[in-house]
């Protein structure tokens, strides 16, 4: 799996912005990716040193629109903690 296939998109929420103060950045990642693959992908794409990776799997919620039933998509979220000597991720720095 390529690094750009593993990292799907960043998560921009109030909570993720607060975590950036602790050098933690949040991403939606491929459901099949493990912590080692996520770490390598972030280091390759953003050129930073990763200290730790936390992952969470979210199940899709059932939704209904009139008589039509369905589910929201299941996804995997990763919180990546950068090493103390590493620089921040430039993409997120402009958002603070």
Swiss-Prot record:
One of its GO terms (cellular component) is ribosome. Keywords: Ribonucleoprotein, Ribosomal protein, RNA-binding, rRNA-binding. GO terms for molecular function: rRNA binding; structural constituent of ribosome. The keyword Ribonucleoprotein applies. GO terms for biological process: translation. The keyword Nuclease does not apply. It comes from the Bacteria. InterPro entries: Nucleotide-bd_a/b_plait_sf, Ribosomal_uL23-like, Ribosomal_uL23/eL15/eS24_sf, Ribosomal_uL23_CS. Part of the 50S ribosomal subunit. Contacts protein L29, and trigger factor when it is bound to the ribosome. Belongs to the universal ribosomal protein uL23 family. One of the early assembly proteins it binds 23S rRNA. One of the proteins that surrounds the polypeptide exit tunnel on the outside of the ribosome. Forms the main docking site for trigger factor binding to the ribosome. This is Large ribosomal subunit protein uL23. It comes from Caldanaerobacter subterraneus subsp. tengcongensis (strain DSM 15242 / JCM 11007 / NBRC 100824 / MB4).
């Amino acid at each position: 799996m390529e690094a750009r296939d593993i990292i799907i998109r960043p998560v921009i929420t109030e909570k993720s912005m607060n975590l950036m103060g602790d050098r933690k950045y949040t991403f939606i990642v491929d459901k099949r990716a493990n912590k080692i693959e996520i770490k390598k992908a972030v280091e390759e794409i953003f050129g930073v040193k990763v200290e730790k990776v936390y992952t969470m799997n979210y199940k899709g919620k059932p939704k209904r629109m009139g008589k039509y039933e369905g589910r929201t998509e299941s996804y995997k979220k990763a919180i990546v903690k950068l090493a103390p000597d590493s620089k921040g991720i430039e993409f997120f720095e402009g958002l603070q």
